[in-house]
C-alpha cells in the first residue's frame, strides 16, 4: 500500500509543470499578443500616411529606403494603385468620403473645395466621423484641403492640427484644435514634416497611456514633395545628378495626335530642362524627411508594443510629371505619371513582402478603414474595402493548391473638371450617339453628285476638292451664291444686300447718269443704317453662323460669304476662276450696274498681296520652296494670334467703357436723389408689358457682365504687375531666382511656362486585366485618345484610329456608365471570366457581355449605319 502523501506530491508536481508550460506559452511574443488582444477585444489602430504630389513613374520611391524596408518588405505592395482624379482637393475629398468626383462635386482645387456646401453635405460623412462615433481616438495632422481656412474644426476629429490653405514647409499657419498657430522659418521648431511627425507620436503615446483599451486612428498628411520643395538643411546636398524623371516621354513634344495643350506644347528650352533637373532633386530631398518620419512612427509602435495591432497605410493624393511631353511640371493629366501612386499596407494578417496586382483606388481608402474598424460600409461610398485582398490567414482547401483569383474590378473612371452647362439656344435633345470620323463623313458626302461639280449647279454652296495628299475636303463655293429657294437663302437675305455680284455697294448716280462711282467708309455706314432695320443692326460684328449641309453643322464666318471686296477669302494658287461672275444679274433682279474703278492692290504681308479681283498673290518663292512656305505661314499664324489677343483686350476695355459712360445732364428732369425720394418710388412695375418677359434674360445678362468685369480686373491686375506670362485660357507660371528660399537655390534667372489649359476637362476609362491594358479618354472638346499600354507603356502614340467603330461605341457606353455611377455596386465593374476577350479572336462585344449590369435608364447609342457616334465626337 502506497504512503498517503505520495498522491499529493505527484499532484503538486503535475500542477507546477502545467504552470510552467503556460508561462512558456505566454512568453512567446506573437502568441502573447494574440491572446491578450482576443481577451481584451481591442480593435486595431489605423495610421494613414499621405504625401502630396508623390509620383511612382518618376522614381520617387527609389530613394526612400526606410519606408520601403518598413512597408514593402514588411507589408503588401499594390503595384496597380491609382487615383480617380489627378488634382489635390478633388482627390483628397475622394479619400475622405470614398466617392468619385461626380458624387462629391469637388471638381477643382477652388470650386467647392472646403466650401459650405461640402461641409454640409459631405464633410459630415467622412470615415473619421464614423470611427469617432464608435470609440476610436481620431487625430489629423498636416495638409487637409487646399481652401481650408482654419475657421472651424472638421467633424470627427478629437485632435486637429490642420494646415491652412496649400502646402508649405515654413511660414505657415496651423489650426490646432480651433486656435490658429503661426510658424516661422526656424527649422528646429517650424519645419512642417518634422512638426506633424512629433505631434502624431506624442498623441499616440498619450492616448495609449490614458486610454489603453481604445484604438487610435491617425492621418499624417505631409506637404512633401509638393512645392515650394523646401528640404531639411541636412539633405540639401543630396542627389546632385538626379535623373529618374528622364523617361521615354521626357521632352517628347509636340504631340499632334493628343489633346489641345499637348498639340501646342513644343520641346522645352535648355533653361526649362535645367529647371526640371533641379526640381526633381529638390523633390527627392523633401521626401527624405518623410522617410525619417516613417522610421520614427515605426519605432514608436515597436516601443509601445502596438506594431502587431496597427494597420499602416502609405499612399499619395496623385502623381506628378516633370518634363513629360514637354510640360515643364504639374499634374492634372490622365496619363500614368499623374494617376499612378505608391500604395503600401502593413498590419495584422498582411503577408510581408507580397506584391498585389489588383487595382486599388483612392476611393477604396475610406471603405477599407471602416472595414478594418469592423464597421459597415455605407452604400453611397463608391469604393470598396481591400481588406479581403490582404487577409493571408483564411483557410484554403489543401486539395486545391492553385488559389482561385478573387473577383475584383478591372476598370475604373478617371475624371477632371465638369461639363459646362449648355446655353438655352443650344440643342436640348442632343443625341447621345457616336459619329463617324470626319474623313469618313466627308468621303460619304463626296459620293453625291451635287458635291462633285465645281460650283456649277444652281444653289450649290459646297464642292468636294482633293488636295495634293489625296484627302477629300469640302470647300465653300466662291463667287455670288445662287440660292435655289432653300432655307439658307431666306436666312441670309436679311443680312446680304440683293445687289449684283460685281458690287454690293450702293450706286451713287450723278446727274449725268453713267459715270464711275465710289463710296467711302462713312457713306457705306450711312447706307447700312438706311437699308437695314434697327433689329438687324448690332454694335458687335457677327462672328460666325452655323450652316447645315445634310444634317452636318459647319461654323462659317460671315466674312467668308462670297462678297466683293472680301479680304478674308481663302485662296489656293492655281485654283480655277469662277465662271459665274458674268451671270450676276439674275441674282439681284435689279439689272446691270455701271462699271466702277477698283482700288489698288492691298499689301497684307511683305510677300503677299490682295489683287483687284479679290485674289491673293504671293512671291513665287513661296510656291516653290517648302521651307519658305512654312516660315511665312508660321509668321502669319503668329500675327493672327497676336491680333486676336489684342482684339480680345480691346473688347474688354470697350465693355468697361460702355459701363462707365458718364451720364448726360438733363436740366428739365427732376433729380431722383431729392428730399422727396420716398414719394417717387413706383409701387408697380415700370416695364412695358412687352418687356416683362425679358427680365430673365436681363438676369443672364447681368451674370455675363459680372464675368466680364472679373476678367477685366484680372487683366488690369496683370498689367499692373507687369505679368507677361499669363495667357488667355492657359495655366502658366513664372519662376525666378527668388522662388526657392532654401538650398539648393535657382540662379539662372526668370522664365515662363504653361502647364495646363482651361479645356483640359476629360473622362477616361482605365482597364487592366489578363487580356487588356488600355486608357480610353473623351475630352470636353470632343477629342478622343486611346493608348494600349501593353505595347505603348509610356503613351507616346494615340491609337484611337486603330479601333473599330463597334469597339469605340462599347468603350463610350462603358465610360458613360461610370460617369453616372453611384455606390460601390455600380462603380466597380468586374469581369466574370478573364480568360475571355480578344485573345481567342473574339470581339470586344463578347468580352463586354460578361460585364453587363443593371444601370439606371440612360440614352444608348443608336445603331445607324451612318451618323455621329456621339455628340461632340472628333476624329
UniProtKB/Swiss-Prot annotation:
Residues 1-415 are annotated as: Catalytic domain. Residues 416-720 are annotated as: Hydrophilic domain. Glycans are attached at residues 65, 112, 132, 149, 171, 198, 241, 539, 566, 588, 613, 722, 759, 769. Its cofactor is Ca(2+). It is found in: Endoplasmic reticulum; Golgi apparatus, Golgi stack; Cell surface. GO terms for molecular function: arylsulfatase activity; calcium ion binding; N-acetylglucosamine-6-sulfatase activity. It comes from the Eukaryota. The record marks 543-544 as: Cleavage. This is Extracellular sulfatase Sulf-2. It comes from Mus musculus. The gene is Sulf2.
Amino acid at each position: 500500500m502506497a504512503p498517503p502523501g505520495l498522491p499529493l506530491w505527484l499532484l503538486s508536481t503535475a500542477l507546477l509543470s502545467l504552470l510552467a508550460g503556460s508561462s512558456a506559452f505566454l512568453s512567446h511574443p506573437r502568441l502573447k499578443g494574440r491572446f491578450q488582444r482576443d481577451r481584451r477585444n481591442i480593435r486595431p489602430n489605423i495610421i494613414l500616411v499621405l504625401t502630396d504630389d508623390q509620383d511612382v513613374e518618376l522614381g520617387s520611391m527609389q530613394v526612400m529606403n526606410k519606408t520601403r524596408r518598413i512597408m514593402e518588405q514588411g507589408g503588401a505592395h499594390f503595384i496597380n494603385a491609382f487615383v480617380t482624379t489627378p488634382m489635390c482637393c478633388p482627390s483628397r475629398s475622394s479619400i475622405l468620403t470614398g466617392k468619385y468626383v461626380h458624387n462629391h462635386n469637388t471638381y477643382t482645387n477652388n470650386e467647392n473645395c472646403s466650401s459650405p456646401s461640402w461641409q454640409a453635405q459631405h464633410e459630415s460623412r467622412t470615415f473619421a466621423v464614423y470611427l469617432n462615433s464608435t470609440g476610436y481616438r481620431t487625430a489629423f495632422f498636416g495638409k487637409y484641403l487646399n481652401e481650408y481656412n482654419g475657421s472651424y474644426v472638421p467633424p470627427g476629429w478629437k485632435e486637429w492640427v490642420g494646415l491652412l490653405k496649400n502646402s508649405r514647409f515654413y511660414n505657415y499657419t496651423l489650426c490646432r484644435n480651433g486656435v490658429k498657430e503661426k510658424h516661422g522659418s526656424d527649422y528646429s521648431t517650424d519645419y512642417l514634416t518634422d512638426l506633424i511627425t512629433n505631434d502624431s507620436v506624442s498623441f499616440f503615446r498619450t492616448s495609449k497611456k490614458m486610454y489603453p483599451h481604445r484604438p487610435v486612428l491617425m492621418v499624417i498628411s505631409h506637404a512633401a514633395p509638393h512645392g515650394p520643395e523646401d528640404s531639411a538643411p541636412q539633405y540639401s546636398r543630396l542627389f546632385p545628378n538626379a535623373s529618374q524623371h528622364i523617361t521615354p516621354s521626357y521632352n517628347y513634344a509636340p504631340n499632334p495626335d493628343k489633346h489641345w495643350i499637348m498639340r501646342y506644347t513644343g520641346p522645352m528650352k535648355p533653361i526649362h530642362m535645367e529647371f526640371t533637373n533641379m526640381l526633381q532633386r529638390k523633390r527627392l530631398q523633401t521626401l527624405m524627411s518623410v522617410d525619417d518620419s516613417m522610421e520614427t512612427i515605426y519605432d514608436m509602435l515597436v516601443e509601445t508594443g502596438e506594431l502587431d495591432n496597427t494597420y499602416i497605410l502609405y499612399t499619395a493624393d496623385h502623381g506628378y510629371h516633370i518634363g513629360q511631353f514637354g510640360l515643364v511640371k504639374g499634374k492634372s493629366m490622365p496619363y500614368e505619371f499623374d494617376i499612378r501612386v505608391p500604395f503600401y499596407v502593413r498590419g495584422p494578417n498582411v503577408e510581408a513582402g507580397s506584391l498585389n496586382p489588383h487595382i486599388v483606388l483612392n476611393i477604396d481608402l475610406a471603405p477599407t478603414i471602416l472595414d478594418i474598424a469592423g464597421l459597415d460600409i455605407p452604400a453611397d461610398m463608391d469604393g470598396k474595402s481591400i481588406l479581403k485582398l490582404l487577409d493571408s490567414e483564411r483557410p484554403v482547401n489543401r486539395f486545391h493548391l492553385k488559389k482561385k483569383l478573387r473577383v475584383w474590378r478591372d476598370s475604373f473612371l478617371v475624371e477632371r473638371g465638369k461639363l459646362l452647362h449648355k446655353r438655352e439656344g443650344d440643342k436640348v435633345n442632343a443625341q447621345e450617339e457616336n459619329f463617324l470620323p470626319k474623313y469618313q463623313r466627308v468621303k460619304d458626302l463626296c459620293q453625291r453628285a451635287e458635291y462633285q461639280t465645281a460650283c456649277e449647279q444652281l444653289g450649290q454652296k459646297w464642292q468636294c476638292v482633293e488636295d495634293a495628299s489625296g484627302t477629300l475636303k469640302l470647300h465653300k463655293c466662291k463667287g455670288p451664291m445662287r440660292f435655289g429657294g432653300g432655307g439658307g437663302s431666306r436666312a441670309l437675305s436679311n443680312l446680304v444686300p440683293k445687289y449684283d455680284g460685281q458690287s454690293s455697294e450702293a450706286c451713287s448716280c450723278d446727274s449725268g447718269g453713267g459715270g464711275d462711282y465710289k463710296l467711302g467708309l462713312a457713306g457705306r455706314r450711312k447706307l447700312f443704317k438706311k437699308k437695314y432695320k434697327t433689329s438687324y443692326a448690332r454694335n458687335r460684328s457677327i462672328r460666325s453662323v452655323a450652316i447645315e449641309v445634310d444634317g452636318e453643322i459647319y461654323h462659317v464666318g460671315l466674312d467668308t460669304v462670297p462678297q466683293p471686296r472680301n479680304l478674308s477669302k481663302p485662296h489656293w494658287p492655281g485654283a480655277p476662276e469662277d465662271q459665274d461672275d458674268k451671270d450676276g444679274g439674275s441674282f439681284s433682279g435689279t439689272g446691270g450696274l455701271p462699271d466702277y474703278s477698283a482700288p489698288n492692290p492691298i499689301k497684307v504681308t511683305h510677300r503677299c498681296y490682295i489683287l483687284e479681283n479679290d485674289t491673293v498673290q504671293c512671291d513665287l518663292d513661296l510656291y516653290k520652296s517648302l521651307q519658305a512656305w512654312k516660315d511665312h505661314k508660321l509668321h502669319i499664324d503668329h500675327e493672327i494670334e497676336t491680333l486676336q489677343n489684342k482684339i480680345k483686350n480691346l473688347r474688354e476695355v470697350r465693355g468697361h467703357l460702355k459701363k462707365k459712360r458718364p451720364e448726360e445732364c438733363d436740366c428739365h428732369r427732376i433729380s431722383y436723389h431729392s428730399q422727396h425720394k420716398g414719394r417717387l418710388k413706383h409701387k408697380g412695375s415700370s416695364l412695358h408689358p412687352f418687356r416683362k418677359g425679358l427680365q430673365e434674360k436681363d438676369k443672364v445678362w447681368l451674370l455675363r457682365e459680372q464675368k466680364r468685369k472679373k476678367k477685366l480686373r484680372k487683366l488690369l491686375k496683370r498689367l499692373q504687375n507687369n505679368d507677361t506670362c499669363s495667357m488667355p485660357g492657359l495655366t502658366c507660371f513664372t519662376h525666378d531666382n527668388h522662388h526657392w528660399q532654401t538650398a539648393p537655390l535657382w540662379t539662372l534667372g526668370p522664365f515662363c511656362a504653361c502647364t495646363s489649359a482651361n479645356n483640359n476637362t476629360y473622362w477616361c476609362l482605365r482597364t487592366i486585366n489578363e487580356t487588356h491594358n488600355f486608357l480610353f479618354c473623351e475630352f470636353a472638346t470632343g477629342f478622343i485618345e486611346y493608348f494600349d499600354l501593353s505595347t505603348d507603356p509610356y503613351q507616346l502614340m494615340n491609337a484611337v484610329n486603330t479601333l473599330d467603330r463597334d469597339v469605340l461605341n462599347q468603350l463610350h457606353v462603358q465610360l458613360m456608365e461610370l460617369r453616372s455611377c453611384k455606390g460601390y455596386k455600380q462603380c466597380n465593374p468586374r469581369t466574370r471570366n478573364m480568360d475571355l476577350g480578344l485573345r481567342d479572336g473574339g470581339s470586344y462585344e463578347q468580352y463586354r457581355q460578361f460585364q453587363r449590369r443593371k444601370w439606371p435608364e440612360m440614352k444608348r447609342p443608336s445603331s445607324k449605319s451612318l451618323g455621329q457616334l456621339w455628340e461632340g465626337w472628333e476624329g
